[in-house]
């Protein structure tokens, strides 16, 4: 065992007072406390080299239980937030009214002169279709009337 591990160098404590260097074990300490341990502002003799805390480890359990409770609450809040976002997204996406297809196609807007020309052409086309339909209808009516007249004449002759 080296002398350097048994010698604690001098240091300034938290209240800014200088603590003289000392040898481990100190008077009044057990024979097992052979090593110099601690921080730059608190040094003491301990039984294991590299030990940094002069306290028993039981106080750590109370700290870790508090930390676990805090982390658990934070996790629940985060989970509630994520679930809320998912529900709102679902409602936003799937509860919209369904769009009905009305059969109309989207058309690009044209200048007014081009639009008027198209309207005039369409009106002329509709009139031509209307006239040909009417003529066909009248032609059919004439044929029906001729047949009716022939049948009437035959009945009269008999």
From Swiss-Prot:
It is a single-pass membrane protein. It comes from the Eukaryota. Its main location: membrane. InterPro entries: Shisa, Shisa_N. The keyword Chloroplast does not apply. It is found in: Membrane. The chain crosses the membrane at residues 65-85. One of its GO terms (cellular component) is membrane. Keywords: Membrane, Transmembrane, Transmembrane helix. It holds the Pfam family Shisa_N. Belongs to the shisa family. This is Protein shisa-like-2B. It comes from Mus musculus (Mouse). The gene is Shisal2b.
């Amino acid at each position: 065992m080296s002398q350097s591990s048994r010698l604690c160098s001098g240091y300034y404590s938290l209240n800014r007072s200088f603590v003289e260097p000392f040898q481990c074990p100190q008077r009044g300490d057990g024979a097992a406390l052979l090593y110099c341990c601690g921080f730059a502002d608190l040094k003491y003799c301990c039984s294991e080299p590299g030990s940094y805390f002069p306290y028993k480890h039981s106080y750590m359990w109370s700290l870790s239980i508090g930390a676990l409770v805090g982390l658990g609450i934070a996790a629940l809040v985060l989970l509630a937030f994520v679930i809320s976002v998912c529900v709102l997204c679902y409602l936003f996406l799937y509860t919209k009214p369904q769009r009905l297809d009305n059969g109309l196609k989207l058309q690009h807007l044209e200048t007014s002169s081009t639009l008027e020309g198209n309207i005039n052409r369409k009106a002329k086309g509709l009139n031509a279709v209307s006239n040909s339909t009417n003529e066909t209808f009248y032609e059919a009516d004439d044929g029906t009337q001729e047949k009716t007249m022939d049948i009437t004449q035959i009945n009269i002759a008999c």
